[in-house]
Amino acid sequence: MDKNCFEKITLAKGEVNLYDFGGMKLHAYRTNDFLADEVFVVEKDGQAVVIESPCFFDNDRELEGYIAGTGLAVAGLLLAYHMAGGGFLPGVKRYATRQADEYGHRGGGKALIDSFTDAFGAAFDNAVHQVTDYVEPGEVTIGGIRFNIIPTHEAFDVEIPEIEAVYTHMLGHDCHSIVAGAAHAGAMIGRLKGFLAKGYRLVLTSHYTPEDLKDVETKIAYLEALTEIASGCAGADSFKAAVKERYGNYGGENYLDMTARFFFG
């Protein structure tokens, strides 16, 4: 599946890129919110599973309306890295690992929710999803759709074997990512090299449109360069300046700021 082979559906605020795999469909919802969030609806035989949640109230309502218009029955939400948006799809089961639940309620995910609440105020749905069903690493079937839960340091990635796709938190071949120091960069590189070995057709992330393995290779090179640059810098300011010089066309400068604090905080 070519990452550019989709039907574009324009909504009032966001948009959906619809990928048709024959027996399954993938609805990639671009929220167009302040955080460039993406949410994914996996469809098979009239049922759907939503991967991650919108976190602004207007996006909650927009995606709910879109799903209702498709006539799909939502079997559950898979919540990994984005636990905000608790008002989305009330009454639908929430699936997560215990580690992801901890990350979203008391760990780094909750710290981000608190920060975004301060930044965005009443527009931000800061209610934390209450997990109804815990899943373990390995294969799980929800709504007749097979997933493979792959634990990570913070939460978990989601493999979708039937469409040869994987969901992870961040990639973005031309934008900065949150990198929590050299060890985290190394772990990310290892995980991305695993994607190459698996030969996924699509890589889905929380903050970018669907990407492919060429984009994965680009990101690996970026992470390796980031670590090299950090090793030669004395502080956050010189680090950011050096990264911007090499990657001047990259977006997500706020993520670079966060990365600099992790490396030099």
Label each region the model flagged.
Residues 3-16, 55, 105-226:
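Metallo-beta-lactamase
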Residues 10-66, 156-170:
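Conserved beta-strand hairpin/beta-sheet module of binuclear metal-dependent hydrolase folds
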Residues 31-32, 45, 52-54, 78-83, ...:
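Active-site-proximal beta-strand/loop segments in catalytic clefts of secreted hydrolases
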